[in-house]
């Protein structure tokens, strides 16, 4: 998975740029020893196979084409070569930091300096652009650079629906509870102030938060060390004064001082800064909505960050003003107000990525023009699609709102340097809406192709897989290598970065449209504390291309050339400079390297042509295949015979095209060409009208060699051949190698690698293979070498099966690998030496590579144990060679299904959530409740929706997990995460959006699974048997066997024993895990910690119904009590239980409850359970009026409970140890324990009431008397229970507090809080803050108050 498609240097700021980097771990692994960025994600490589005739590649048309060259312009212009090396001058060095020559920008601007992007508006769909960053304030002609800054995800939303009014001195109480002073100069005719608050770290990136935490902890540690020193001084002084005292009071005083010191030391160890709270205030000044922010908590200085000192902001688009939270963070933000002041969006970036992207596209540096972006005259809007709550992951909500904003602002271009893998190309809700934006609103959409190279089929969505979006690959020139990457010796020629994703798509489309420079030193946000940074990736090539297209837009607008995404795309593709003469390299580079000047010449010449694009859909004749966008033959079977394909060619006009003036007269005569007539057969001419035309293609790959082959069928306008290909049908043929031997193996000897070289092999994986063991040996080189190893297999309706490794060889050596494969599918093996690895060495790397296929086939890949005692029979075979059958099955997770307890549909406010078509987006909120009996790591899963963002017809999915205190523990989207939760009850809310209410209605009972990890000690290892009765009888254990090729071996998988099942698992839950069958061969065991074969399969066990307890009714002697007596007991207990049914909120309820109590007491005098229930109800009764009388009532009720109990008899009974076999004695003991608990609870409640009365009284004499009663009551309590436990600890805390032993009180209270058997109680934390303030630890009090907003927020945040 990736989403940000850029890489950065190995610095703290760089880490922020790539918080959830492009693909897996390659960002971290692919950093070149001397090249800052060489961080790549998934692997993909340039093709080395060369087959097929000449292609109408970029810039080289089969007929007259606009002036172009077959190779990119020399990147060495302005440099000097010495001894075969590459040297930079100072100007060319600066140029290399922001590459533009490579795409012809220098030539274009030299001819048209006024067409530098002026008049072009670009929407940046990314992580949020910093409006304070260098080069992003104005355009080259003095206009504002950034016209709007929008958080489309909602991650910065603050609920400001609470309205307050100022008091007489001009102060209000903010949402955080802080008293805020209003600036008297602020106009507010209504005098209504909307207030909200937010933890400021929720607005910051992890990198910025980490820096702030370090800075703030330094200051906090200083204060804490002072407090520790003072506490230690007090303890030492006490020890000197009372060193030999054995007095109990002196001992307790000493313990108190020791507790204070211990508490401070533990605070330092457990310090976790969750950040201060900022208060947000919004109001309407009579003209517009305004926002002010109070950041005193962040400043750390009472004189800074005050609300009244803040310069009010309004929606950014109105005044284009931004704020800075504090000097410490240097983080800028903007504000947008929605829903009549009830919602304020505080917009910050979630990564430096977007600012860097925006700088490449359009930065303007008047003092250093060489560092300008590609289109310094262009203007921008920032659409934040990366959600800060999710680390910077894009969300469906963010993507759709961004499209809405782009249309609303009438943008000319969109740049999106984000993406994900997909199982279906050109499919999904966002793809549909993006196509509408392009086709109807004429916005040019440009996106990154992905960083998953060097293997083929690695382009991601949406850039590399969507017909309406221009996907851009990443190119590195010699100048970029020498300057931006600072390599010791630049390569002689430019090349595609090793990690740049390659095509084709699963449905045969080319995947990569064009290439552009994929690295730059560009602006980054101010909070990084630097002005610019080096990043590379297709994230950088996309804005480079987008900036180049913005120049075209600027020129076309200025010269009155009709602007259309169709025309622009044809211009840039047909004039791109070829990077390689090898046809197969088109899958790597697309049509070539963008050339702005030539594209403009093309656009000028094509200005009178119809604004039309040809859409292609292809079907194989005789097969009911889905509509394809290319022909893709991948496998030995498809290459053994000739195939015929029907191509449907449909002209696509913009939606506002006139029927009579454009559609009816449209007619084009096209001559068809193929790049290799020996393989591809086509008609010679076709006539195309508005309703389209079909023609057939015959592909005969029978006689071609093994490997990769790429061909094209393209049409040329007979009347205007200079236009180049009007449409192209990409044809990719992969003919794999068939292996032999036992086991099947492929040996590649003496492969020679230099920097950037890629070797590809395509292998027909034998049926029956399930894993591969690889040996890679290197030799004959000097400096360390880094290699990317990738394998890819394509499965229908599934993301590509991909394995990858990044390996560094410090010296000649051998490495072993093993990974799973799917039998019967073609496997691509890519071995690539990283583009900058060994670049200064003249010695090639010699590589020997051996790949051996192994496999154990089973008759059922997914095993489901149904919860019964019966085992499951499995039949295993080895089809390739002898293998050792060693089954291992482990159940390590439990999945519990839940249905929503509540579902709610609501129409969202139109300010952000109305589509350009006018359709209103609707939200479905599903509420689930679940309970954990013990702490656990859990992950919510929604099988219908998870793991699909672009290839999903539902717009958005977002969940959050909270407790009864409204504390949010976790949130997530399409890729749920594990979160560690304590014991307790939790609420999960799932938020789904769409404009079709009928679709949402179908999801109202959507099943969600809570997946819980088992602790390692609780993993369940299943047993195997050679007999069907083995699990029951306990014999016939199966351990291992040798499989002879073709001969089946059967065994049974037994269910887990009842004793091994996890506790507190609900029936209907499913234990899940994995099972493996084979073992890797001995040569690779040294490298593999786990010697089991890497091919694993799913296994599950359904939790059966609970055991029926037949012992419940045993021991009930019919002769002990008569039926009449038992009936009386039942009636009595029901009446007592009924007491809890009164809420006592109304006078009628109170009088009814009192009457019931009055009737029950005489009927059941001295019956302790009744009196205990009465006490419980009185304690729970609301007391807003007379608190003193209420406490007196509690004391009276508690005394009645105490008086009802014979304490001597109780003590005697509890001291006796009953006979464990005497059932009656055991029941009596349990009854006595219940009575003891009722006594203790009465004493506890009485003590709390006495303390409360004491706090309400002011008369000293009564206070002294109350102290005696309190102490007497407390001493009675500790006779029966440990008063320091969680249940009774509050009274101990009050007692220690009354005695002035605040340290001891704090210790007891902290122990209560840390007991995770219950969820946090606000009253305990409030008491904790009171104790800390009484001690005088200001810094600890401030810390705890900040945590209160985390544990007990006033409300759940908006979605």
UniProtKB/Swiss-Prot annotation:
InterPro entries tied to this protein: Peptidase_S8/S53_dom (IPR000209), Peptidase_S8/S53_dom_sf (IPR036852), Peptidase_S8_Ser-AS (IPR023828), Peptidase_S8_subtilisin-like (IPR050131), Peptidase_S8_subtilisin-rel (IPR015500), TPP_II_domain (IPR034051), TPPII_C_sf (IPR046939), TPPII_GBD (IPR048384)
GO cellular component, one term: cytosol
UniProt entry keywords in alphabetical sequence: Aminopeptidase, Hydrolase, Protease, Serine protease
Chain ranges of the Peptidase S8 domain: 102-600
Domain of life: Eukaryota
EC assignment: 3.4.14.10
Renumbered residue ranges of the record's region Disordered: 45-81
GO molecular function, one term: mRNA binding
Enzymatic reactions: Release of an N-terminal tripeptide from a polypeptide
Compositionally biased region (Low complexity): 64-81
GO terms under biological process: proteolysis
Leading EC class: hydrolase
Record: active site: 126 (charge relay system), 353 (charge relay system), 539 (charge relay system)
Claim: Nucleotide-binding is one of the keywords in the record: no
The keyword Lyase appears for this protein: no
Signal peptide range in chain numbering: none
Role played: Serine protease that may function in the proteasome pathway.
Family statement: Belongs to the peptidase S8 family.
Designated name of the protein: Tripeptidyl-peptidase 2
Protein's gene: TPP2
């Amino acid at each position: 998975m990736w989403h940000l498609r850029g890489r950065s240097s190995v610095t703290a700021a760089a880490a922020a740029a790539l918080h959830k980097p492009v693909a897996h771990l390659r960002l971290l692994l692919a950093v070149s020893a001397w090249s800052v960025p060489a961080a790549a994600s998934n692997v993909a490589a340039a093709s080395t196979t060369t087959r097929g005739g000449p292609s109408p590649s970029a810039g080289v048309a089969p007929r007259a084409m606009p002036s172009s060259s077959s190779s990119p312009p020399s990147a060495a212009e302005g440099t000097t070569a010495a001894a075969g090396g590459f040297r930079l001058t100072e100007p060319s060095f600066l140029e290399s930091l922001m590459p533009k020559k490579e795409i012809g920008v220098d030539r274009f601007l030299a001819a048209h300096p006024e067409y530098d992007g002026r008049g072009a508006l670009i929407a940046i769909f990314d992580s949020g652009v910093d409006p304070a960053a260098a080069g992003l304030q104005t355009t080259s002609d003095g206009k504002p650079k950034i016209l709007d800054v929008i958080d489309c995800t909602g991650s910065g939303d603050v609920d400001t629906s609470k309205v307050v009014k100022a008091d007489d001195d001009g102060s209000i109480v903010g949402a955080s509870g802080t008293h805020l002073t209003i600036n008297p100069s602020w106009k507010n005719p209504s005098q209504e102030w909307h207030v909200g608050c937010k933890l400021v770290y929720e607005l910051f990136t992890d990198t910025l938060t980490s820096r702030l935490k370090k800075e703030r902890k330094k200051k906090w540690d200083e204060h804490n060390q002072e407090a520790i020193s003072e506490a230690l001084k007090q303890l030492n002084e006490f020890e000197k004064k009372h060193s030999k005292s054995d007095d109990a009071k002196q001992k307790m005083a000493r313990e108190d001082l020791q507790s204070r010191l211990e508490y401070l030391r533990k605070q330092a160890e457990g310090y976790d800064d969750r950040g201060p709270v900022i208060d947000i205030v919004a109001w309407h000044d009579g003209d517009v909505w305004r926002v002010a922010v109070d950041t005193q908590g962040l400043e750390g200085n009472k004189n800074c960050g005050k609300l009244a000192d803040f310069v009010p902001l309004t929606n950014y688009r109105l005044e284009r003003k931004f704020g800075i939270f504090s000097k410490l963070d240097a983080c800028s933000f903007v504000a947008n107000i929605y829903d009549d002041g009830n919602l304020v969006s505080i917009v910050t970036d979630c990564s430096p990525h977007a600012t860097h992207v925006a700088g490449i596209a359009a930065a303007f540096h008047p003092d250093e023009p060489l560092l300008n972006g590609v289109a310094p005259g262009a203007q921008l809007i920032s659409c934040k699609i990366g959600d800060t709550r999710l680390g910077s992951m894009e969300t469906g909500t963010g993507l759709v709102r961004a499209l809405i904003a782009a249309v609303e602002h009438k943008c000319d271009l969109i740049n999106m340097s984000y993406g994900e893998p997909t199982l279906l190309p050109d499919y999904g809700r966002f793809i549909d809406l993006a196509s509408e934006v392009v086709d109807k609103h004429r916005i040019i959409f440009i996106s990154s192709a992905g960083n998953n190279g060097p293997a083929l089929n690695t382009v991601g969505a949406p850039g590399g897989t969507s017909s309406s979006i221009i996907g851009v690959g990443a190119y590195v020139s010699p100048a970029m290598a020498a300057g931006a990457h600072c390599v010791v010796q630049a390569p002689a020629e430019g090349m595609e970065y090793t990690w740049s994703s390659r095509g084709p798509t699963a449905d045969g489309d080319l995947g990569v449209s064009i290439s552009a420079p994929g690295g730059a030193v560009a602006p980054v946000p101010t909070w990084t504390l630097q002005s610019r940074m080096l990043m590379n990736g297709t994230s950088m090539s996309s804005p480079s291309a987008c900036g180049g297209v913005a120049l075209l837009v600027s020129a076309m607008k200025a010269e009155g050339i009709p602007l259309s995404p169709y025309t622009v795309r044809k211009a840039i593709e047909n004039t791109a400079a070829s990077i390689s003469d090898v046809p197969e390299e088109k899958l790597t580079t697309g049509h070539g390297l963008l050339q702005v000047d030539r594209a403009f010449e093309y656009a000028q010449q094509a200005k009178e042509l119809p604004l039309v694009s040809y859409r292609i859909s292809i079907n194989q004749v005789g097969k009911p295949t889905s509509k394809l966008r290319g022909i893709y033959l991948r496998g030995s079977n498809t290459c053994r015979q000739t195939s015929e394909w029907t191509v449907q060619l449909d002209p696509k006009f913009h939606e506002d095209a006139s029927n009579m003036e454009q559609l009816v007269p449209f007619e084009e005569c096209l001559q068809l060409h193929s790049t290799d007539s020996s393989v591809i057969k086509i008609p010679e001419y076709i006539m195309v009208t508005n309703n389209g035309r079909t023609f057939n293609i015959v592909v005969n790959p029978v006689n071609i060699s093994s490997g990769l082959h790429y061909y094209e069928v393209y049409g040329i306008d007979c009347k205007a051949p200079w236009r180049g290909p009007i449409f192209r049908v990409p044809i990719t043929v992969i003919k794999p190698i068939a292996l032999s031997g036992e086991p099947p193996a492929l040996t590649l000897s003496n492969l020679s690698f230099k920097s950037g070289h890629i070797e590809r092999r395509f292998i027909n994986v034998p049926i029956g293979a399930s894993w591969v063991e690889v040996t890679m040996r290197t030799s004959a080189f000097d400096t360390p070498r880094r290699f990317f190893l990738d394998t890819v297999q394509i499965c229908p309706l599934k993301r590509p099966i991909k394995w990858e490794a990044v390996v560094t060889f410090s010296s000649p050596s051998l490495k072993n690998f093993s990974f799973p494969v799917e039998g019967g599918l073609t496997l691509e093996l890519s071995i690539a030496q990283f583009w900058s690895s060994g670049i200064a060495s003249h010695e090639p790397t010699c590589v020997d590579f051996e790949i051996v296929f192994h496999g154990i086939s089973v008759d059922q890949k997914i095993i489901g144990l149904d919860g019964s005692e019966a085992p499951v029979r499995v039949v295993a075979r080895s089809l390739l060679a002898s293998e050792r059958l060693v089954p291992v099955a482990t159940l390590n997770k439990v999945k519990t299904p839940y249905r929503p307890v509540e579902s709610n549909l609501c129409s969202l406010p139109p300010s952000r959530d109305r589509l350009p078509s006018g359709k209103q987006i609707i939200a479905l909120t599903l509420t689930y409740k679940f309970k954990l009996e013990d702490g656990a790591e859990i992950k919510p899963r929604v099988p219908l929706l998870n793991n699909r963002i672009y290839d999903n017809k539902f717009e958005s999915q977002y969940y959050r997990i909270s407790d009864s205190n409204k504390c949010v523990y976790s949130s997530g989207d399409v890729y749920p995460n594990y979160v560690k939760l304590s014991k307790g009850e939790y609420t999960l809310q799932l938020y789904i959006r769409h404009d079709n209410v009928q679709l949402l209605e179908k999801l109202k009972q959507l099943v969600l699974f809570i997946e819980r990890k088992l602790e390692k000690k609780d993993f369940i290892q299943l047993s195997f048997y050679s007999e069907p009765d083995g699990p029951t009888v306990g014999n016939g254990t199966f351990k291992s066997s040798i499989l002879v090729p073709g001969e089946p071996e059967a065994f049974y998988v037994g269910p887990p024993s009842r004793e091994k099942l996890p506790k507190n698992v609900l029936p209907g839950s499913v234990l899940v895990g994995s099972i493996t069958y084979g073992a890797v061969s001995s040569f690779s065991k040294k490298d593999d910690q786990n010697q089991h074969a890497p091919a694993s399969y799913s296994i599950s066990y359904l939790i059966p119904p609970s055991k029926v307890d037949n012992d419940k009714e045993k021991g009930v002697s019919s002769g002990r009590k008569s039926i009449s007596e038992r009936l009386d007991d039942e009636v009595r207990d029901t009446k007592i239980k009924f007491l809890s049914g009164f809420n006592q909120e109304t006078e009628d309820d109170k009088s009814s409850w009192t009457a019931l109590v009055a009737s029950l007491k005489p009927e059941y005098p001295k019956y302790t359970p009744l009196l205990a229930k009465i006490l419980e109800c009185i304690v729970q009764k609301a007391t807003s009026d007379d608190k003193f009388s209420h406490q007196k009532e509690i004391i009276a009720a508690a005394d009645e409970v105490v008086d009802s109990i014979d304490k001597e008899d109780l003590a005697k009974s509890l001291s006796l140890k009953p006979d464990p076999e005497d059932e009656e004695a055991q029941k009596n003991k349990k009854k006595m324990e219940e009575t003891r608990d009722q006594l203790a609870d009465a004493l506890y409640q009485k003590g709390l009431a006495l303390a409360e009365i004491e706090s309400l009284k002011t008369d000293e004499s009564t206070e002294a008397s109350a102290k005696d009663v309190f102490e007497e009551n407390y001493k009675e309590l500790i006779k029966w229970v440990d008063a320091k436990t969680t249940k009774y600890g509050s009274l101990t805390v009050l007692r220690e507090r009354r005695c002035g032993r605040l340290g001891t009180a704090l210790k007891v209270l902290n122990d209560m809080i840390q007991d995770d058997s219950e969820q946090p109680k606000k009253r305990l934390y409030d008491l904790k803050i009171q104790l800390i303030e009484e001690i005088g630890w200001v810094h600890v009090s401030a810390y705890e108050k900040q945590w209160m907003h985390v544990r007990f927020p006033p409300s759940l945040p908006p979605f």
